Swiss-Prot record:
Reactions this protein catalyses: 5,6-dimethylbenzimidazole + nicotinate beta-D-ribonucleotide = alpha-ribazole 5'-phosphate + nicotinate + H(+)
Keyword Transferase assigned: yes
Species per Swiss-Prot/TrEMBL record: Salmonella arizonae (strain ATCC BAA-731 / CDC346-86 / RSK2980)
Keywords: Cobalamin biosynthesis, Glycosyltransferase, Transferase
Disulfide cross-links: none
Function: Catalyzes the synthesis of alpha-ribazole-5'-phosphate from nicotinate mononucleotide (NAMN) and 5,6-dimethylbenzimidazole (DMB).
GO MF annotations in UniProt: nicotinate-nucleotide-dimethylbenzimidazole phosphoribosyltransferase activity
An annotated GO BP: cobalamin biosynthetic process
Quaternary data: Homodimer.
Active site location: E317 (proton acceptor)
Name under which the protein is recorded: Nicotinate-nucleotide--dimethylbenzimidazole phosphoribosyltransferase
Gene: cobT
Length: 354
């Protein structure tokens, strides 16, 4: 059984030769080169992923939704009762939440995973629970480093097992009342931004309570002193079990050489952690949508990513990742199904007849 260090060491580099071949193929399709814009770049990115065997393709699709509660809820940083985490997790098993509807439309299976819900176990939910909620980051660490490492390893293995069973496209999501607070803390740490720049309203927090949320994030960072150069340290000190879980999906997908669609602000914070832990992960991440949460722009700038969709969404759950899955499939369809210029005897300006 491989250790976490060994798994991370084995993340493959993109296949640049396959990417070059893909670009050459795309340039010869029935269109002016570059005219399908970022769809072309996405197809080339996919071609470079070793788990896809050198060609853009989508097999089975899976949405992994990490569910957990947060001790920082006690600081008044969320309007929803904590029990809503458990209620919504149960609703996910019935297919009635936003991510479930959008994932069904995209043909993706939703895996609802309990990594720290503060309630009795829920039928139909995958049990990877570390504890009933993490610690209150405003007074101490969210969890121990050991807890974070064990959960990362478990999620990586779960993700790789799905890959072995035919999943070639992953999406990440989360569920947890008050979880935008630790996400903002992580973004603040990784980007060097003040809490005021990255703290937003989350699930409709009244403007009158934003200053308290900013103060909570600042206190969490001051008390825990997370090391911005150590992704696991940041996750364990000011993160949460759901954020660790999403990071694990990204690491696991990359280990298998497969793409993973990010969701919104919560996933950006996890992506920052994943890229700090293993920079090679970056090549396997696909940004789905531009979250309406305040700190989104700063997080995305630090990741050097431009999402494909601008929908003013901030639901979370993985809803944006599910919505973007057809875009990935469209890039594959373009690559495989379009005709070629040469077959139609079309010579574009600046090219030579062969």
């Amino acid at each position: 059984m491989q250790t976490l260090h060994a798994l991370l060491r084995d993340i493959p580099a993109p296949d640049t030769d396959a990417m070059a071949r893909a670009q050459q193929h795309i340039d010869g399709l029935l269109k002016p080169p570059g005219s399908l814009g970022r769809l072309e770049a996405l197809a080339v990115q996919l071609a470079g992923m070793p788990g896809l065997n050198g060609t853009p393709q989508v097999g089975e699709k899976a949405m992994l939704v990490m569910c957990a509660d947060h001790g920082v809820w006690d600081e008044g940083v969320a309007v929803s009762p904590k029990i809503v985490t458990a209620i919504q997790a149960a609703n996910m098993t019935r297919g009635t939440t936003g991510v479930c509807v959008l994932a069904a439309q995209a043909g993706a299976k939703v895996h609802v995973i309990d990594v720290g819900i503060d309630a009795e176990p829920i039928p139909g939910v995958v049990n990877m629970r570390v504890a009933r909620g993490c610690g209150n980051i405003a007074v101490g660490p969210a969890m121990s480093r050991s807890q974070a490492e064990v959960l990362l390893l478990e999620v990586i293995r779960y993700t790789c097992d799905l890959a072995q069973r035919g999943v070639t496209l992953f999406g990440v999501g989360e569920l947890g009342m008050a979880n935008t607070t630790p996400a903002a803390a992580m973004v603040s740490v990784f980007t060097g931004s003040d809490a005021k720049e990255v703290v937003g309203i989350g699930a409709n927090l009244p403007p009158s309570r934003i200053d308290n949320k900013v103060d909570v994030v600042r206190r969490a960072i001051a008390i825990n002193q997370p090391d911005p150069h150590d992704g696991i340290d940041v996750l364990s000190k000011v993160g949460g079990f759901d954020l660790v879980g999403m990071t694990g999906v990204m690491l696991g997908a990359a280990r298998c050489g497969l793409p993973v669609l990010l969701d919104g602000f919560l996933s950006y914070s996890a992506a920052l952690a994943a890229c700090q832990i293993a920079p090679a992960v970056r090549s396997y991440l696909i940004p789905s949508h531009f979250s309406a949460e305040k700190g989104a722009r700063i997080a995305l700038a630090h990741l050097a990513m431009e999402p494909y969709l601008h929908m003013a969404m901030r639901l979370g759950e993985g809803s944006g990742a599910a919505l973007a899955m057809p875009i990935v499939e469209a890039a594959c369809a373009m690559f495989h199904n379009m005709g070629e210029l040469a077959a139609s005897n079309i010579v574009l300006p600046g090219e030579k007849q062969t």
